[in-house]
A protein has these predicted regions:
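A glycine- and small/hydrophobic-rich beta-loop-beta segment
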Residues: 257, 261, 269-344
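Short acidic-hydrophobic, aromatic-tinged amphipathic segments that line or gate anion-handling sites
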Residues: 1-7, 179-184, 306-311
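C-terminal core of ALDH-fold dehydrogenases
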Residues: 320-434
Length: 434
């Protein structure tokens, strides 16, 4: 247990320090080589990598519509109903985010507009691994659908049978995803960013992944001919704020639900109650023994931090300094403390709001900034699948009214051509008035 008030400024930073992210020169070089090969060889390179890492007998990158429909039909009624429920809630929440265009007159004769339009082509990346992730399909696919993105494609690693999990196929079809491609890793990111004969080039890439995927997203986003990306990514994390009234079993379950994501997941409990901390630690051990993914969760919990604060206000100070991806607030009258919480990717308020709700079906998006990026990045939302642009229209009166100010500013900056573009119009107006 760490006592927050006894720490120096540097010790507080150390208590909240995250593990160093993979950023080796070797990783950069390997990913760079993969991107270069995909750019040069296209489908053949992607097929070769996919055969090497995922499916030795893969013959095509494209999952046929027939296979998508057949796989979707295999989903059990219970899971299909759950996906439908999550889809409806996520759709409702993201539909409410639809922005309105703006049009106003800033100066007599000067009209300014702000308009929004959907991105044309988006690439959604769904990682492989030990379990399917239909929830991530929904979190990426639903806002793309609501935004009105015309072309939505999905890349995910195939299994040994050249297929994907039925749940992913069902969720993708539900979201109106146009095409599914059987590839993963840096090679999938490169294919979507640069385009191949099979995989169309997209405007923006969304979705989580391992260090190779993360590095590939960073590299393609820095290329003029590449693609934009959603946000920086790091290991998943949770911080639980709890007082003496919190249920230690709930607290432990929330810490463990984060830890089971992976051994590098971060789990932190900050409380003003030493008793609550000790009871929560004991509950963690009891619950950990019952988990099917205990071997994954245990290393993460061995690195968990338990911080004792003098007060709830001090606990919130620690929380703001950490800027957690997921912030669970199990405090009496939790909503009253919202104005004091500055930084978090998503907040789970009160004892009946586990992280699992947002991860799956409450309606909010589970793609969130990690690694402290919650201080300057936001959770994924509808606007990430759109772009905004401005329009200005000046009438003759608008030019008369605003022209002198434009010319004065252009002259002050020494940009003669800017000044001349207005001066010529002002002169034409004077001649017309004569």
């Amino acid at each position: 247990m760490i006592t927050w008030s006894s720490l120096s400024v540097n010790e507080k930073k150390q208590a909240l320090a995250r593990p160093a992210m993979a950023n080796s020169q070797q990783l950069k070089q390997t990913v760079g080589d993969i991107i270069a090969r995909v750019e040069k060889e296209g489908d053949e390179a992607v097929l070769d990598y996919t055969r090497k890492f995922d499916c030795p007998d893969l013959t095509s990158l494209v999952l046929s519509q027939e296979n998508i429909d057949a796989l979707a039909a295999k989903v059990t009624p219970e899971v299909a109903s759950a996906i439908d429920t999550a889809f409806n809630n996520i759709k409702m929440f993201h539909e409410a985010q639809m922005p309105s265009d703006i049009a106003l007159t800033t100066t007599p004769g000067v009209k300014c507009e702000l308009r929004f339009t959907a991105l044309d082509a988006v690439g959604l990346y769904i990682p492989g691994g030990s379990a399917p992730l239909p929830s991530t399909v929904l979190m990426l696919g639903v806002p793309a659908l609501v935004a009105g993105c015309e072309n939505k494609l999905l890349c995910t690693p195939p299994n040994k049978e050249q297929l994907i999990a039925p749940e992913i196929a069902y969720a993708a079809r539900k979201c109106g995803i146009d095409k599914i491609f059987l590839c993963g890793g840096a090679q999938a990111i490169a294919a979507m960013a640069l385009g191949t004969d099979s995989v169309p080039q997209v405007d923006k890439i969304f979705g989580p992944g391992n260090s190779f995927v993360t590095e590939a997203k960073q590299q393609v986003s820095q290329r003029a001919d590449g693609a934009a990306i959603d946000m920086p990514a790091g290991p998943s994390e949770v911080l639980v704020l709890a007082d003496e009234f919190a249920n230690p079993e709930f607290v432990a379950a929330d810490l463990l639900s984060q830890a089971e994501h992976g051994p590098d997941s971060q789990a932190i409990l900050v409380s003003n109650s030493a008793t609550l901390i000790e009871e929560s630690k004991a509950a963690v051990e009891r619950q950990l023994a019952t988990l099917s993914r205990a071997e994954i969760a245990r290393p993460a919990m061995e690195n968990a931090r338990y911080i004792l604060a003098d007060s709830i206000e001090q606990a919130i100070e620690a929380s703001n300094a950490y800027a957690a991806e997921h912030l669970i607030v199990q405090i009496e009258n939790a909503r009253d403390y919202l104005p004091k919480i500055k930084y978090a990717g998503s907040i789970f308020l009160g004892p009946w709001s586990p992280e699992s709700a947002g991860d799956y079906a409450s309606g909010t998006n589970h793609v969130l900034p990690t690694y402290g990026y919650a201080k300057n990045y936001s959770s994924l939302g509808l606007l990430d699948f759109m772009r905004r642009y401005t329009i200005q229209e000046l009438s003759a009166d608008g030019m008369r009214n605003l022209g002198p100010a434009i010319m004065a500013l252009a002259a002050a900056e020494g940009l003669d051509a800017h000044e001349q573009a207005v001066a010529l119009r002002m002169q034409a107006l004077k001649q017309g008035d004569a």
